[in-house]
């Protein structure tokens, strides 16, 4: 099932028992964030949370942990809620192959129901803002899909970026913006080189697939809307934003339009990040908000970030695994699977066959130089093709049985990494590491690896038989 907006997805979550409505009065701080944080501590099938009785707010509707379980992630893709995570990743990869699917332009977007413009813009009157961690420097929009265009090629649909970035509210019509090292940063650099402001649209409360693709590491000229269509199995609905003329999701709850002011900076942060650590305050670009459009009684969606696991890890797990898999397979068809579930792919586990000795290390180095790897992928573990990278006991076995640190651990100094990586020194620069836990092949003949003790041929048949017998007994 393809969802056109957040509300229809929340309805499905409720029908599937994956939405918990909390009607008792709660405090905006610390209750909202603490409740969302708690979902990551009660198991892999925790529900989304909906609050409609928040002290100090009039008529607020707040949704959290919308993608925060494998059950919810499966439902977002239109799969049964009990679909195992590895099958979700495999289905994600199959749908990727349908890319591109052209979007469907629609009129009468629901977010056109209400408007604030110019001096009347007051974000505090529209959004029920609260801090997510007690050390945050202010209020954040952290689950927005931000739309920008390449100033040198404004009409190229593929170069129109839709991405998730952290945004601090610093005034009624001012935002501090952290572009990280992604596509919007390139757009901003090009605009500032010309001395121009960069138009921008910030969309809040989007359909569940749009939220997934906005955090997906895609090539610069690949359209997130066309990828959303592939994942949905139907064209993604878009509409034209009235001020910028940008293509924005048709079903958003709120659309904020304005400009990133050229060469202006303000202190942004600190903010508790997906790394499980705060990133300190830095001078960041400033957005001047010129128009806000929003639905009647908008649902404000927010994303808790902190020590894993939490919603962020479910949201950006599969959508990081699959692009890396596709990019690596384009050059190394021997690659079998990629597990990039951990901290948005700062660590990656790759299973691969080998053409010859040293081949696995080459795959690891290529992973570090993919579009996503340049800013993330700081540690790569390589395992044989018969080791499941999603099965951590198998991975630990491969590392313990096959790794000789002298020959199988490679450390490469002074490579790029995103500034938010807490281990970077200085910010944006880090050593990176490859651990080759594969079995050596000629001409690499190190070690004493006899014929491996593999599963008996009948094991898979017996596993299925035992599962049937157990199910029948229950």
From Swiss-Prot:
Listed cofactors: prenylated FMN; Mn(2+)
Task: Report residues binding Mn(2+).
Answer: 161, 182, 224
EC number per UniProt? 4.1.1.-
Q: Which HAMAP family match?
A: UbiD_YclC
Q: Which UniProt keywords apply?
A: Aromatic hydrocarbons catabolism, Decarboxylase, Detoxification, Flavoprotein, FMN, Lyase, Manganese, Metal-binding
Gene encoding this chain?
A: vdcC
Q: Which Pfam families match?
A: UbiD, UbiD_C, UbiD_N
Protein's UniProt name: Phenolic acid decarboxylase
Q: What induces it?
A: By vanillate.
